[in-house]
């Protein structure tokens, strides 16, 4: 049985004080939730405040990005080693906004994945198709390319440090959500790819989560699907009440 994984990606929101207040509320409300992994991903400038507030809590912290070198003349960048030193456990890699706004390639994303794993952190590898790609029936082609490129060079042991997040680009920040069956179909395909690359044991162990306008009103249906192991939550994670409800999803 795969342990559910719920992560909140705050993107470019929340001052340090606001971030600390939010996780303080989450820490109290979710202290009794012990059967799933809970993660928050604040902006870099709020990491210290969030990590300090979450001391003695089971809620983990992720960074939203990294650079795939540990040190050097890379002005403005942050390495996985420094993120680990700060107290992070996860790094989001390959988010569609990084791919689209900053032209990050599959090969560059693969470098990040390897760097995160080498630093002893876990990577949340984001993949997903655009609306144009879905309408052109290229969804599976895109997912296969992103999975194979993103995981290239990894072995079965490294896959223990990977969470795959399927985020259909057309459903991010648009209010649109993939139907339960659309999401399950994509997740099942992704798991079949992992099976093809690493074998059935890894495929059955790897967690594949859904991201794309996850809200309290749709999380229960999504998390009832057999291959959906959690959620990467965007806007709804900025509201304590909404995120708490999502973490406490009622899948049956």
Curated annotation (Swiss-Prot):
Q: Which UniProt keywords apply?
A: Cytoplasm, Gluconeogenesis, Glycolysis, Isomerase
Annotated active site residues, numbered on this chain, are 95, 167
Q: Where in the cell is it found?
A: Cytoplasm
Listed InterPro entries: Aldolase_TIM, TIM_sf, TrioseP_Isoase_bac/euk, Triosephosphate_isomerase, Triosephosphate_isomerase_AS
**Reported function:** Involved in the gluconeogenesis. Catalyzes stereospecifically the conversion of dihydroxyacetone phosphate (DHAP) to D-glyceraldehyde-3-phosphate (G3P).
Q: Name one GO biological process term.
A: gluconeogenesis
Q: Catalyses which reaction?
A: D-glyceraldehyde 3-phosphate = dihydroxyacetone phosphate
Protein name as catalogued: Triosephosphate isomerase
- Give the record's family classification: Belongs to the triosephosphate isomerase family.
Q: In which pathway does it act?
A: Carbohydrate biosynthesis; gluconeogenesis; Carbohydrate degradation; glycolysis; D-glyceraldehyde 3-phosphate from glycerone phosphate: step 1/1
Q: Which domain of life is it from?
A: Bacteria
Q: Can you tell me which residues bind substrate?
A: 9-11, 173, 213, 234-235
Q: Any keyword Methyltransferase? A: no
> Oligomeric state and partners?
Homodimer.
Its principal location? cytoplasm
Q: What is its EC number?
A: 5.3.1.1
Query: What Gene Ontology molecular-function terms does this entry list?
Result: triose-phosphate isomerase activity
A GO term from the CC aspect = cytosol
Source species, please?
Syntrophotalea carbinolica (strain DSM 2380 / NBRC 103641 / GraBd1) (Pelobacter carbinolicus)
